[in-house]
Each structure stands twice: as C-alpha cells, then as structure tokens.
A protein has these predicted regions:
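Regulatory and interdomain segments flanking nucleotide-handling catalytic cores
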Residues: 1-180
Length: 180
C-alpha cells in the first residue's frame, strides 16, 4: 500500500513561486520525502507518494506551510492503494492509489481536504473528521499556521521553547495552539 497526495495551491498567482515553492520543498525535505517522490506540475499542482501512515501528517503539514503565507491555501486529496506502475515522473505513475487520490480530488468541490481508500466505511468516518478539522485549518492566520507547524514538527517542545524559537511570547503561542 502507498499514499498519494494530489494538491493544488489556491491563489498561487498572488504570491511568487519562489516563496511558496521553497517552503514546500523544505517541508517535504524535513518530513523525509525524497525529491524523486514528489513533483510540481502545471505550475501550482503537486503530487507526491508517501507511506500511508505519513499521508495525513504530510497533508496537514502542507496545509500549515501554505497558510503561513497570506492569501495562500491548498486543496488536496489523499489516495491510499497500490501503485502498479512507477515512472520517473510521479505524475506519470499509476495504480489504485493514484486513482483514489484523483477521484477524491475531483470530488472536493469547495472542500480543501479529503481521503479515499479501498475501505468505504473508513473513508466516510475519516472524511467527516477531516471536514471538521478543515473548518479550523481553512481559517488559520499565518502566525497560527506557523506555530501549529512548529508544534507538529516538534511535538516534544514546550510552548516556551516554541515561543523562543519563533521570537514570540509564550502567551501568543498558547493562544494560537488553542485556536488551531
């Protein structure tokens, strides 16, 4: 089994690709995703392959990194399944994981996050949870997204340590984590 994330950057034309693309690359590199496992295509679309256990973590990390930039957001779909054909280009690979990711992406409409797996009951439950999480994530302010991402990447850090590393007050970190 593999996980495939298909995503589009929302409002990508409002921000220089140098800004969001470098943040995206750093996020994927810090998460241990090899460059050969992801691709930016059509200018602002992203597709990546990951282990299923890491797919949701990566999705939330990508959401947090894009929300750090004013007016930027991301729509993404996670597909879980087999990969039956691997190409040098991620976007040319194929299999149920890609089909599930593409189907979930096509069904997003106004949603920004969804998952499709071989298990319908699992999908129904998890997509309800993702809809609820998206109500908060879609409204993150840049500072909240930055603090959330720092906590996500460093779960053992105390709020005081996060505050020091981001040059913020501990009370602001506490407030942002509660809101996010």
């Amino acid at each position: 089994m593999e996980g495939v994330i298909t995503a589009d950057i929302i409002n990508s034309r409002e921000v220089s690709p140098d800004i969001w693309l470098n943040l995206l690359k750093d996020t994927l590199q810090n998460a241990g995703v090899e460059h050969s496992s992801w691709e930016v295509y059509r200018g602002d679309s992203i597709q990546l392959i990951t282990k299923p256990i890491n797919a949701l973590y990566l999705g939330i990390s990508l959401k947090a990194v894009t929300k750090q930039i004013p007016n930027l957001d991301i729509r993404m779909a996670i597909g879980i399944g087999e990969i039956t054909y691997r190409s040098e280009k991620v976007s040319s690979s194929n299999g149920p994981a890609f089909i599930n990711s593409g189907a979930a992406f096509d069904a997003l409409n106004k949603k920004t996050l969804a998952i499709k797996t071989p298990w319908k009951d699992f999908d129904e439950v998890l997509n309800i949870m993702l809809d609820l999480a998206a109500l908060t994530m879609d409204n993150w302010k840049p500072a909240m997204a930055e603090i959330f991402k720092k906590q996500l990447e460093n779960p053992t850090l105390k709020q005081v340590e996060i505050a020091a590393s981001l040059h913020k007050k501990q009370s602001n970190v506490s407030y942002s984590l509660k809101k996010s």
